[in-house]
Structure formats: structure tokens, C-alpha cells
């Protein structure tokens, strides 16, 4: 009897320990939840999210990575982007994959009639030695599009022009090809057309080691650099360097992260919105996904804008959602009426790119926010483009 009682007591203790371990394992720090992931489904064919057919070039200049901003003080829209050297004779199609000569700027009162302001920064006259140097190209090399390349990588890509309201100052951010990093320029005249010089933080080397640098000014005047394509750093008060090292943005990723580019941060309705660009690819079941094998470029379909939102600029950003099909590497801005617009450039790559009559030209797309999400405004696009004949 004593033996049975002792065994029963021991069994009760074992059951109690097991129950305690079970409770601890299902609560508090012991709870290992499955990480949240973004849905990689690409809604190819969804008309309301696709760049409308009414959209056409607003300027007959070869350009990629179109950027537009509106400056209320003078009532002008300013346009820039990745351009090709205007006096260069190409073997085959116009491109910027090896070299170009600098940064160009246009302005307009209505986004339909553009005034050329010329080259506002050049390698030969304005660049620092590290920017002029470039990188050699192997003989016989071609671009991703099959364009024959010259002997040097020395092109400036993806420029952005920003008026920093809290400092009454114009800055430009841009990057170099050939793995030579990104930089920030400041206008020494206080005007958007410059002339421009390097800030101290990139006088001798790149301020960010990769491409596609962007800039964001918050409501409190804090200015951040946002880099390819998951990094952010606050600038110092003088805007001549960084106040902190670049850190990784907290995101909700896909199960397998693809190549992502064209970063942009915008604040709307108290939230921060992280815009990025990613390619869709077809799946065996007929659907499309943003998860792909980066080596299979031949199956690229559409060049899409995805968006994620957060309550803080560093994140965490929630699940990504598709916003603009075939409108990638964009920025968004508000016009003089407070209406929203996005930029695009008719990327020739991918299946959808082959459908364009003309590619690599700047365009703008009216967009809207519906239930906190960004999307094209097809009705406004039709109205804007009805008297533009290209």
C-alpha cells in the first residue's frame, strides 16, 4: 500500500511538471510564432492596378527612372531621370548602361509643356576624383538588353531632386553604375538648377555603397537617406553627412526575397509608406509571383510597384501589397491641388514591356489612396492625357 502511494505521488509530480512545462512553452518568451510573410502573388491582369493605356510620354527624351517633384514656391514641376549622353552616337539602341555625361533637368507649369534647363551636373566639371574614375569594362561586353558597351562604366543613374523645407535647401541624390555607390549633392545657389557640389559626407567616397539612393524629409524636419533597397540612415543637422550608420529597415519579407529596387518612402495619413519595385514572373499554374530565380531573366513579365506601411520610419512595415502593375522605379508626389501622382518610364524589359510602342520616356500617372492603399486613378489619367499627342 505504501509502495502504491509513493508511486502515485511520484506520478502526480511528473504530471504537474509536464503541465507547467507545457504552459511555459505556450506563452511568454517561449512562444515561437511563425514569422509573418508578405503574399508574393502578383495580380497580373487586374485592370484597376495596371498602368492605364491612356498614359503616354510627356517628353520625347530617352530616360529611365523618371523623377518629378512639385515646388509650391515657384509653381514649377521639376523633372529629372537617368539619361543618355545627347551627343553620343550609338551602335544599336540608345542606352546608359556604360556611361553618360551627367544630370539634366526640366521644368513645367502643367506637366505637359516642358522647358529644358540643361545639364546641371557633369562628370568633367563637377565630379570628385572618385566619381570621375569609373570602372573598366571587358571587351565585347553587352548590357542586359544586349547593347554593345564601351570601355568604361561611368554613368550617373536614378537622380532625385529634393527641396528640404526645414532648411530651405535643394539636394540631389544619385548613384553610379559599376558598383561605385551613391552620393548627395547640394545646390550652392539655393536654386533647383544648381550649380551642385558634393556634400562633405561623400567628398572622397560614396556615402552609400550601393545604387538607388533616395531621400525622405519627415514632418519634424528630420532627413533620411534610404538606400537599395532595404537600408536607411538619418542625416545630420547640417545635411552634409550622416548622423548614424545605415541600418536595415524592418520589413515583412516574402518567403524568398527576390531582387528589389527603386526604393521610395512617403508619409500619408500619419503612416510611412515604403515603395519598392519588383518583377513578376509566371508560375506553372498560370498565376504570377514576385518570387523568382534571379537567373531566369527571360521569363520576366511586369515591372511592378509594391507598397508596405508602418507607424515609424524605421518600421516595422506590414505586409507588402501590389500597387501599380508595370509602373516600377517611381516616385510619388502631390500637385498644386494636393492630388497624387506617380512617375514611370515604360521599361522595355519583360513581356509587358514588349507591348509598348515606345520605351524609355518619362510619364506621369494619377494615383489615389483607397482604404489606405495606393493604386492608379484611371479616370484622372484619361482626363490628363486627352490633349497630349505623342
Labelled PLM ranges:
Residues 23-25:
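C-terminal motif of bacterial Sec signal peptides marking the signal peptidase cleavage site
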Residues 4-15:
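Bacterial N-terminal signal peptides that target proteins for export
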Residues 27-390:
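Carbohydrate-active catalytic/glycan-binding domains of CAZyme proteins
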Amino acid at each position: 500500500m505504501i509502495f502504491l502511494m509513493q508511486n502515485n505521488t511520484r506520478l502526480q509530480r511528473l504530471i504537474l511538471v509536464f503541465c507547467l512545462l507545457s504552459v511555459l512553452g505556450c506563452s511568454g518568451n517561449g512562444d515561437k510564432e511563425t514569422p509573418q510573410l508578405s503574399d508574393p502573388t502578383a495580380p497580373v491582369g487586374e485592370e484597376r492596378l495596371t498602368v492605364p493605356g491612356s498614359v503616354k510620354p510627356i517628353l520625347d527624351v530617352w530616360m529611365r527612372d523618371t523623377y518629378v517633384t512639385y515646388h509650391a514656391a515657384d509653381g514649377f514641376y521639376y523633372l529629372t531621370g537617368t539619361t543618355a549622353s545627347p551627343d553620343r552616337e550609338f551602335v544599336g539602341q540608345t542606352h546608359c548602361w556604360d556611361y553618360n555625361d551627367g544630370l539634366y533637368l526640366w521644368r513645367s507649369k502643367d506637366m505637359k509643356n516642358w522647358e529644358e534647363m540643361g545639364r546641371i551636373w557633369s562628370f568633367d566639371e563637377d565630379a570628385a576624383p572618385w566619381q570621375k574614375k569609373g570602372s573598366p569594362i571587358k571587351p565585347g561586353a553587352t548590357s542586359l538588353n544586349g547593347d554593345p558597351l564601351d570601355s568604361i562604366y561611368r554613368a550617373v543613374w536614378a537622380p532625385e531632386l529634393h527641396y528640404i523645407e526645414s532648411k530651405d535647401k535643394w539636394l540631389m541624390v544619385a548613384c553610379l553604375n559599376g558598383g561605385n555607390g551613391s552620393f548627395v549633392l547640394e545646390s550652392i545657389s539655393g536654386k533647383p538648377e544648381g550649380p551642385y557640389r558634393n556634400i562633405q559626407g561623400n567628398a572622397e567616397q560614396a556615402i552609400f555603397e550601393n545604387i538607388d539612393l533616395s531621400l525622405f524629409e519627415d514632418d519634424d524636419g528630420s532627413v533620411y537617406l534610404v538606400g537599395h533597397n532595404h537600408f536607411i540612415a538619418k542625416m545630420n543637422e547640417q545635411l552634409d553627412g550622416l548622423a548614424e550608420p545605415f541600418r536595415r529597415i524592418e520589413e515583412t519579407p516574402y518567403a524568398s526575397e527576390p531582387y528589389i529596387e527603386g526604393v521610395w518612402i512617403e508619409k500619408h495619413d500619419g503612416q510611412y509608406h515604403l515603395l519598392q519595385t519588383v518583377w513578376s514572373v509566371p508560375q506553372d499554374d498560370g498565376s504570377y509571383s514576385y518570387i523568382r530565380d534571379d537567373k531566369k531573366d527571360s521569363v520576366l513579365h511586369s515591372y511592378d510597384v509594391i507598397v508596405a506601411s508602418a507607424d515609424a520610419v524605421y518600421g516595422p512595415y506590414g505586409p507588402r501589397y501590389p500597387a501599380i502593375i508595370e509602373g516600377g522605379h517611381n516616385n510619388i508626389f502631390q500637385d498644386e491641388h494636393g492630388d497624387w501622382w506617380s512617375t514611370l518610364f515604360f521599361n522595355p524589359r519583360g513581356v509587358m514591356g514588349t507591348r509598348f510602342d515606345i520605351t524609355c520616356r518619362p510619364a506621369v500617372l494619377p494615383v489615389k489612396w483607397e482604404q489606405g492603399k495606393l493604386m492608379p486613378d484611371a479616370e484622372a489619367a484619361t482626363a490628363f492625357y486627352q490633349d497630349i499627342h505623342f
